[in-house]
């Protein structure tokens, strides 16, 4: 029973996922600090408020807090896209560009048979 669990945990996908979660948590703290401490300070100087939490309050409905969450999400998404996704895509494209093109696949048995039939038909016509 424990041997099967050990095999499951030691598979590459589980280890990669665990590392990704840990790195994602650490990166999330960095991005949250960037948003809350730097970018929202810039928003505060432009708009006059550090966030929108108290802007639109209708009783228990805090629409401003929802708007602040959306702004944070958009900033975090843009930061992740431009700081992680774009460089990884460019690196992947660069490595693909430097790889030799794959060799064409060998003809299948069906293709060989069709080629023989074609050649025989050409011989009968001439």
From Swiss-Prot:
Which InterPro entries does the record associate with it?
A: Mechanosensitive_channel_CS, MS_channel, MSC/AndL, MscL_channel
Cellular location(s): Cell membrane
A Pfam family annotated for this UniProt entry = MscL
Q: Which SUPFAM superfamilies match?
A: Gated mechanosensitive channel (SSF81330)
| Flavoprotein found in the keyword field | no
A GO cellular-component term linked to this record: plasma membrane
Q: What is its main location?
A: membrane
GO MF terms, alphabetically ordered: mechanosensitive monoatomic ion channel activity
Annotated membrane-spanning segments are 14-34, 66-86
Topology term for the membrane: Multi-pass membrane protein
What are the alphabetically sorted keywords of the record? Cell membrane, Ion channel, Ion transport, Membrane, Transmembrane, Transmembrane helix, Transport
Q: Which PANTHER family match?
A: LARGE-CONDUCTANCE MECHANOSENSITIVE CHANNEL, MECHANOSENSITIVE CHANNEL MSCL
Q: Which family does it belong to?
A: Belongs to the MscL family.
Q: What does this protein do?
A: Channel that opens in response to stretch forces in the membrane lipid bilayer. May participate in the regulation of osmotic pressure changes within the cell.
The subunit structure is: Homopentamer.
State what protein this is by name: Large-conductance mechanosensitive channel
Q: Which organism is it from?
A: Roseiflexus sp. (strain RS-1)
